[in-house]
Amino acid sequence: MTTPESIKRTIEAGLPCDHVEVRGDGQHFEAVIVSNAFEGLAKVRRHQRVYAALGDRMREEVHALSMTTLTPAEWLLRRTDA
């Protein structure tokens, strides 16, 4: 079974990340991904970068992935507002 930790490691291996959180039940996952690689990118392009990092795992193992993709500055603002 696919675990949140294994999804996290795959994302981190394929994308330079400052922070990654993944929760899920083995098929359905939620992720928060913070990366400088998202600077200047629209939400759709950010998600495409994460899908590319996941590669075949996204097609073969993950049924659904809900994600929040943030730059470090956006993450800091979100944490400060909380």
What kind of region is each of these model predictions?
Residues 1-27:
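N-terminal first-folded block
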Residues 7-11, 46-60:
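Short, non-transmembrane amphipathic alpha-helical segments
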Residues 28-30, 75:
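Short, active-site-adjacent cap segments at secondary-structure transitions
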Residues 32-45:
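A short interface-forming secondary-structure element
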Residues 23, 32-34, 68-70:
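Solvent-exposed beta-strand sheet faces enriched in polar/charged residues
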Residues 28, 47, 63:
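Histidine-centered active-site/metal-ligand motif
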Residues 52-82:
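C-terminal structural segments of small proteins and small subunits
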